[in-house]
Amino acid sequence: MDAAEKKKIIEEYATHPGDTGSPDVQVAILTKRIAELTEHLKVHKGDHHSRRGLMLMVGQRRRLLNYIAKNDIEHYRELIARLGLRR
């Protein structure tokens, strides 16, 4: 993911201008990185170092989503619908 893609994601999921660290933004960025790394691992099946990084990212996203769900369940449902998670 290059800087332009990251900036676009930040603008789309920011809760206010200048917001780069809210849980929504973090989850959106992690989702993009997870998708890219998943595609990489489909080609490079033996890349176990990257697989471990993927598992760490999935765990981090899960923790952030748990935090959002605990604080505002409706917001959580909207976010996972926007991201296309939990089909």
Swiss-Prot record:
GO terms for cellular component: cytosolic small ribosomal subunit. SUPFAM superfamilies: S15/NS1 RNA-binding domain. InterPro entries: Ribosomal_uS15 (IPR000589), Ribosomal_uS15_bac-type (IPR005290), uS15_NS1_RNA-bd_sf (IPR009068). The keyword Ribosomal protein applies. One of its GO terms (biological process) is translation. The keyword Thylakoid does not apply. Pfam families: Ribosomal_S15. Part of the 30S ribosomal subunit. Forms a bridge to the 50S subunit in the 70S ribosome, contacting the 23S rRNA. One of the primary rRNA binding proteins, it binds directly to 16S rRNA where it helps nucleate assembly of the platform of the 30S subunit by binding and bridging several RNA helices of the 16S rRNA. Forms an intersubunit bridge (bridge B4) with the 23S rRNA of the 50S subunit in the ribosome. Belongs to the universal ribosomal protein uS15 family. NCBIfam families: S15_bact. This is Small ribosomal subunit protein uS15. The lineage of its organism: Bacteria, Bacillati, Actinomycetota, Actinomycetes, Propionibacteriales.
